[in-house]
Design a protein with these regions (language model features):
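Conserved N-terminal catalytic/coupling substructures associated with nucleotide/phosphate chemistry
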Residues: 1-144
Length: 144
């Protein structure tokens, strides 16, 4: 898939940010996956799960959906290079009460520009069980 094809796909499937969809640039996931609370991937996953579930698109510019790609080359889990499967496992490990059912990371790498985009599909929290990240239940206030 070319970068243009991927951008068209993203625009058709995830046309705008809303309560169920967030776009994040995160050019380098090494310090962004489980990093500063509130600004890292696990905090966003918690917040989206605690609404109705949805999608986190990583590797695109906020507001424009321009593909910038994300670098996972220095991201490791337990000393092993990260991939979509190990990142999914890490999410369930770091996000208390996050259901693995419906949780999925879809990975796209453009053929022409070699840019990587991850789409994290996030299930809704279980009844009376908010999803925690950094021992807190996150919520998307601006989307209420």
């Amino acid at each position: 898939m070319t970068e243009l094809d991927l951008q068209q796909y993203l625009l058709s499937e995830y046309p705008q940010e809303n309560a169920r969809c967030e776009w994040k640039e995160y050019k380098n996931l090494k310090n962004s996956f489980c990093g500063d609370e509130k600004d890292d991937v696990i905090s966003y996953v918690s917040a989206i799960a605690n609404m109705e579930g949805g999608h986190l698109v990583i590797g695109v510019k906020d507001k424009t959906l321009e593909i910038v790609g994300t670098d996972i080359s220095r991201l490791t889990f337990n000393g092993q290079p990260a991939n979509a499967q190990s990142a999914t496992f890490k999410l369930t490990e770091q996000c208390t009460y996050l259901s693995s059912e419906g949780l999925n990371i879809e990975e796209f790498v453009t053929d022409d520009t070699n840019k990587r985009v991850w789409i994290i599909h996030i299930p809704k929290h279980l009844p009376r069980r908010p999803v925690l990240a950094h021992k807190k239940a996150w919520q998307r206030i601006e989307d209420l």
